[in-house]
């Protein structure tokens, strides 16, 4: 009996007929027997992309495959590949087929107007300040931005974009087609007269667009840097002061009391020092022990080395240098004075002590002269010990001391009594008129400021911040490396920078900078008292050498011409005379090679060279040293061009460098 069920071939034909009558909607299930696996059209070989104005993928792609898009398949489904389609997305209602007939006819978008070319000079890629675009014509006259070029007749009516200009790195530009209308003249069009505009024309065009020139920017930046450098780490100006004067005038006592009154030495430490001084039988010296720290200085009551301390006022920071007042330590005093900006000349008003220090043999005169020759142009004269029973804040005694000092400082030392010198009475031991003004009941005749009040309100000092770096070496010692100490006379220094040691031409690297408070800092400027840790071959570096800029080193010479004023001389001075020269921190033996001229009171030179020189004369001479010494002309750098001559413990002359011969 034959089976009524159709065979496999007949079933396929029936299913095919049914399938052909199905509508192909968004969810219409389709099936083609023995069809190939589903492969999206864009993955088939030879696929050519066609712009789909409706966005997304066209639905007709499934009809050719004969597969249900929702059926499982080895390849990934359409939803997995296109979960976040780009461009226009299909409506979320998948059952609705998009009606493309309602879409407007597609019109290609107009090409965007080319943006103005921005020329970047000096690596600055930031946008120009002006919002007006800059157009540079490279093929003759420039087309105006408001006129559109006419399209060629062979092309469609759609607007043709302007030709593109290649980047500046290729250095090749395509000339723009000439416009039909006559353009307006501009500075940019006049600059571009050749097919390839020169670099100079491009640079001028960019400068015309930006009003601020490179030179102005550099000047403003330099001014900002200078202002930042002049602001110290605490926002206060740094000043170096040195206490000078005859032995036992009260320099160390005054310095110790300043440290206590400014809080640099706390009360507990001061009580400990006072207790130690009382046990040693020197109770009245306890304030000076804050600076005189060595056993020799405390035992003898005399300062030997230059004491160093640091204190602050409201507007300034101070490095205090306590110079020895004994005659045998004048060399140390010169070393301290060479690093100071302001000198404090301490005078004892006690009967007999003032006369001993000011008359012949005392150090008051010599210290005042040395301070002037070492570049201390402002002197504060402190009349100390006004509380002594022999004085008792006497106005008569105060004026007596001031009158004698003012005459000497004006005639011999060269200070102007009205502008360069300030006098004030104090009591270093009791602290009266040191920080706070003396009470009117104690001293009714003095109405001026106290010592610290005056130092804090002085006019600002001149600093050569922009000059090449110069720092004479005041001391050298080992502390986890080599430490070089001194005062920066010009310029500035930064950590990890290189410096040149003159006169030996040795390069060193600055690995660390420490200020007067022993704190490490990244940079320092002129006027600061610093310690530099250096790296390199420093075996030959010694005190008196100069750290300087590697690009602009100081001069080092063995022969120079100087103008000299003779102060004290036991005999006559002739050719071949030798003595010791103190210049900045260097100490070197020098000899007179030639006596060139004698100067009269008006500084007029004599026609014939003098045979000899005596006390009170001014001469011009040629001097020689055995080894090179760092120096500069006095008119160029005063602190590197002035010197002092000493012989047998006496200051015989002072001078300034006029000309460097080598």
UniProtKB/Swiss-Prot annotation:
Family: Belongs to the TRAFAC class translation factor GTPase superfamily. Classic translation factor GTPase family. ERF3 subfamily.
Protein's recorded name: Eukaryotic peptide chain release factor GTP-binding subunit
Region (G3) location: 322-325
Role played: GTPase component of the eRF1-eRF3-GTP ternary complex, a ternary complex that mediates translation termination in response to the termination codons. Sup35/eRF3 mediates sup45/ERF1 delivery to stop codons: The eRF1-eRF3-GTP complex binds to a stop codon in the ribosomal A-site. GTP hydrolysis by sup35/eRF3 induces a conformational change that leads to its dissociation, permitting sup45/eRF1 to accommodate fully in the A-site.
Domain annotation tr-type G: ranges: 236-464
Keywords: Cytoplasm, GTP-binding, Hydrolase, Nucleotide-binding, Phosphoprotein, Protein biosynthesis, Repeat
UniProt-annotated stretches for the region G2: 301-305
Chief localization: cytoplasm
GO biological processes: cytoplasmic translational termination; nuclear-transcribed mRNA catabolic process, deadenylation-dependent decay; translation
Catalytic activity: GTP + H2O = GDP + phosphate + H(+)
Compartment(s) where it occurs, according to its Swiss-Prot or TrEMBL record: Cytoplasm
